[in-house]
Amino acid sequence: MAFLKKSLFLVLFLGIVSLSICEEEKREGEEEEKQEEENEELSEEELRERRALLDKLKSLGKVVGKVAIGVAQHYLNPQQ
């Protein structure tokens, strides 16, 4: 009878240990998935920010170009 008790306790102990290891791995996997999703979201936000910055620089370049042309025309044709 004592042998059966020891065997049963051993089986239960090993089952609990393996179950806790599986749950820990599952939690780690979920955390990694959350981190990957956050990284993807950050990447999308960074892309939006970069696009907005490039659009602003493009607009600024157009304005500077027009001003430069206006200044050049003013100095080349001072009669106007």
UniProtKB/Swiss-Prot annotation:
Record carries keyword Membrane: no
Propeptide feature ranges: 23-49
Biased composition (Acidic residues): 30-44
Signal peptide: 1-22
Keyword annotations of the record: Amphibian defense peptide, Antibiotic, Antimicrobial, Cleavage on pair of basic residues, Secreted, Signal
Tissue specificity annotation: Expressed by the skin glands.
Subcellular location: Secreted
GO biological process: defense response to bacterium
A GO cellular component entry from the record: extracellular region
Sequence segments annotated as region (Disordered): 27-46
InterPro entries: Frog_antimicrobial_propeptide, FSAP
Superkingdom to which the source organism belongs: Eukaryota
Family, similarity comment: Belongs to the frog skin active peptide (FSAP) family. Dermaseptin subfamily.
Function: Has antibacterial activity.
Protein name as catalogued: Raniseptin-8
Species this chain originates from: Boana raniceps
